[in-house]
Amino acid sequence: LSSVKEMIDSTPKSKIGMLCNLGDFLHWDGLEQLTPSGKNLLEGDSRYSRIVDIAMTVMDEAVRMMLKKYEKVVFVCAEGNHDIAGSIWLRKFIRKLYANEPRLEVIDNDFPYYAYRHGETMLCFHHGHKAKMGSLPKVFASEPRFREDWGQSKIAYIHSGHYHHERLLEDAGAITEQHPTLASRDSYATRLGLMSQRGAKVITYDATDGEVARITVRPKT
């Protein structure tokens, strides 16, 4: 939560704050420490019930911190390939917990692509496990549920994760960004020699001009 607090403290006092979990918030998805689709063995050192409890506590506290600063908070909890089921119950948990909080909007759908239009700026999100980075503008532009927002936007910003290292691509009317992770390497990544700098981005968007500022937060531990 220290990184979340640092991110919130570093932002201007905007009317709207968006909390985006790009997926894989939970490393595994049930009582067995396996990826849900590929059944690949994952490294873990605790009971799933404890992981669930920590996930709920951290996300709840992050939402509470944001509600203290912003007039409205938008919450995105994207499906990841490691937490297909976990992303569902975490999203539902926050929606139910804050059912009487009109200042919180939870983007609650099972479709693993998510979007929010801020004036003429469209913000799009997908973990990156179903569509490659270069094809994401086509997915969001052609998907019927997003077509109207895409047409009414001057620019679209698409955010993905999955690969844990940074990339930026501007093409087809969109800027697509692949984000790093706050998580440290597990033994799988370490043994394969996979390295990337940990971090999270805090991006400020204007309703007309799109991105106007950004800050990178690096975890201290």
Regions found by a protein language model. Name each.
Residues 1-104:
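Core catalytic region of metal-dependent phosphoesterases/phosphodiesterases
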Residues 67, 94-110, 119-220:
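Conserved beta-sheet core of the metallophosphoesterase superfamily
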